[in-house]
Amino acid sequence: MNSSPLIVVMGVSGSGKSTIGEALAARLGVRFDDADALHPASNVAKMASGMALTDDDRMPWLALVGAELAAATGGLVIACSALKRVYREAILAAAPSTRFVFLDGSRTLLESRVRHREGHFMPASLLDSQLATLEPLTPHEPGVRVSLDDHPTVESVVRTLVALLTPQVE
């Protein structure tokens, strides 16, 4: 595997982007960041109040995500929703060697996870909005999809990802 992989762990709220991203980064021996920390205060306030972000809200944030990936030395795994293809294209414009990991799960599983999560600014009420916005990763995009329903543990997801990503990041 490439010793400096650039990986975006993507999906809707509750998919486990941060948890899986941290575990994957540890397995690969690279740094982990959460793109939520790059949101401007106005985006955080908007989401915390139950309002969905617009594309205009997201584009400056995605530019920061892409810049962080482009500047990374030694590899980086970053958790970022990257719900639409145009968002992923914005990231790829800044960091073309980025690979995406799409954490896909049933609405029932995702809702359960969101409702049991504490201390996050994203309310469960926005899950439907995110699912409506989601454009799943396509075969023409650089990355892989993992079903959370088929892989119920973090270890199972990470093991599967390492196996799937190895040929892509070498």
Task: Mark where each language-model region is.
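Hydrophobic anchor at the beta1->P-loop junction of P-loop NTPases
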Residues: 9
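Small-molecule kinase domains that catalyze NTP-dependent phosphoryl transfer to phosphate-bearing small molecules
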Residues: 116-160
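P-loop (Walker A) phosphate-binding loop of NTP-binding proteins
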Residues: 12
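Conserved substrate/cofactor phosphate-moiety recognition/catalytic segment
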Residues: 22-67
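Conserved phosphate-donor/acceptor-positioning beta-strand/loop module used by diverse small-molecule
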Residues: 94-114
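Loop/turn-to-beta-strand initiation segments
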Residues: 73-76, 98-99
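Conserved lysine of the Walker
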Residues: 17
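Walker A (P-loop) ATP-phosphate-binding motif of ABC ATPase nucleotide-binding domains
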Residues: 6
